[in-house]
C-alpha cells in the first residue's frame, strides 16, 4: 500500500485497454489484397466449411478475414475492404470482409438485410 506522499510523487498508472482489432490501427476499415482464399472448419460443436481469406493490409499486417453471405467472387489478388468483428467459432478470425465494395460483389438474390451484404434493392416485378 503506497503512502500519500508516494502517490503524490508518482501517480497510479491507468490500465491500458487492449484493442480487439489491432490491424485496423484505429481506423473503421482497411483496404487489403487477398493472398489466399480458402475454407476452414469451425470449433466443436459446430460443423461447416466457412469461407475465409488471408488478406495483406495497407497497414502492413496480414490477417485472416471472414467472407460473409452465400457465395462469393473472391480469388487471390482481389482487393477487399475489411472491418473489425470476430467469428466466434473460428479461432484467429477477427475481421470481416465488407461485401459490395472494391472487388467484392454483393450477395445475389438477397431480399432481407441487404445493406449488410452489399446488395442493391431489387427491381419490382412487372404485372
From Swiss-Prot:
HAMAP family (alphabetical): Ribosomal_uS12_B
Cellular component GO terms, alphabetical: small ribosomal subunit
GO molecular function: rRNA binding; structural constituent of ribosome; tRNA binding
CDD domains reported in the protein's UniProt record: Ribosomal_S12
Source domain of life: Bacteria
Protein name from the UniProt record: Small ribosomal subunit protein uS12
Family: Belongs to the universal ribosomal protein uS12 family.
Basic residues: compositionally biased ranges: 113-127
InterPro entries listed in its UniProt record: NA-bd_OB-fold (IPR012340), Ribosomal_uS12 (IPR006032), Ribosomal_uS12_bac (IPR005679)
Keywords attached to this entry: Methylation, Ribonucleoprotein, Ribosomal protein, RNA-binding, rRNA-binding, tRNA-binding
NCBIfam families, alphabetized: rpsL_bact
Gene: rpsL
UniProt GO BP: translation
Spans annotated as Disordered: 102-127
Subunit-structure text: Part of the 30S ribosomal subunit. Contacts proteins S8 and S17. May interact with IF1 in the 30S initiation complex.
Annotated function: With S4 and S5 plays an important role in translational accuracy.
Pfam families to which the protein is assigned, alphabetical: Ribosom_S12_S23
Residues annotated with 3-methylthioaspartic acid modification: 89
Amino acid at each position: 500500500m503506497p503512502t500519500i506522499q508516494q502517490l503524490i510523487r508518482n501517480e497510479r498508472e491507468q490500465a491500458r485497454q487492449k484493442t480487439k482489432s489491432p490491424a485496423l490501427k484505429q481506423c473503421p476499415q482497411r483496404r487489403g489484397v487477398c493472398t489466399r482464399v480458402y475454407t476452414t472448419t469451425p470449433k466443436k460443436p459446430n460443423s461447416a466449411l466457412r469461407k475465409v481469406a488471408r488478406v495483406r493490409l495497407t497497414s502492413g499486417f496480414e490477417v485472416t478475414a471472414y467472407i460473409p453471405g452465400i457465395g462469393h467472387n473472391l480469388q487471390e489478388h482481389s482487393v477487399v475492404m475489411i472491418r473489425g468483428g470476430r467469428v466466434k467459432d473460428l479461432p484467429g478470425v477477427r475481421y470481416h470482409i465488407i461485401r459490395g465494395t472494391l472487388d467484392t460483389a454483393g450477395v445475389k438474390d438477397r431480399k432481407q438485410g441487404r445493406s449488410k451484404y452489399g446488395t442493391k434493392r431489387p427491381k419490382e416485378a412487372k404485372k
